[in-house]
Amino acid sequence: MVTIRLARGGSKKRPFYHLTVTNSRNPRDGRFVERIGFFNPIATGAEVKLSVNQERAAYWLSQGAQPSERVAQLLKEAAKAAA
């Protein structure tokens, strides 16, 4: 099954996540089909906290990709910010 989920990056104590489209059987930070955005939970000041390519996210959702719980929240938040 194709899923949209977060892949962790960054360094110790400073998480940074990429929103990735991947096969659900692949490791969390492993192989992916496409990166469609990023999420920086500890962004401060003028740093961008969330960036999502809405067109690609809509495409993958229309193709049957299942977002994780957290990604579903982030997509909703990004759609609200874009409107």
UniProtKB/Swiss-Prot annotation:
Keywords: Ribonucleoprotein, Ribosomal protein. InterPro entries: Ribosomal_bS16, Ribosomal_bS16_dom_sf. The keyword Ribonucleoprotein applies. It comes from the Bacteria. GO terms for molecular function: structural constituent of ribosome. GO terms for cellular component: cytoplasm; small ribosomal subunit. GO terms for biological process: translation. The keyword Coiled coil does not apply. HAMAP family: Ribosomal_bS16. Belongs to the bacterial ribosomal protein bS16 family. PANTHER family: 30S RIBOSOMAL PROTEIN S16, SMALL RIBOSOMAL SUBUNIT PROTEIN BS16M. This is Small ribosomal subunit protein bS16.
